[in-house]
Amino acid sequence: MSELSQGVRGAQQETVTEQKIASTLGSGGLAVYATPCMIALMEYCAMESVRPYLPQGSSTVGTRLDIKHLAATPIGMTVRCETELIEVDRRRLVFLCRAFDEAGLIGEGTQERFIVDDEKFMEKVSQKIKK
């Protein structure tokens, strides 16, 4: 984990399909790229960008989002996400996130993730069921 530092970048993309539109997901009534899908792509992009730097048996979990969805994207267009790690504070990671369609910027903001030990994290989660 010592190699993880500011400046790590990620990039991911997906095509807007019927399954990824607001009217299908219930997040809106129109046939445009759904905000939850854009956010999920941003989270995936950030998560994957730092995965090679994490110790074995560790992951990151999302804890905070401040995202603006700026423009609508129709079915069939490709959405590209870019992330940059802008802050590292022990296990806390902050990413700048931007999403683009073929016409330009459609979303931007920041995302916070924490590095967790997979086994300890899942043990804590499983304790909820036992209560």
Report the location of each language-model feature.
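Short beta-strand edge segments in extracellular beta-sheet folds
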Residues: 15-17, 112-116
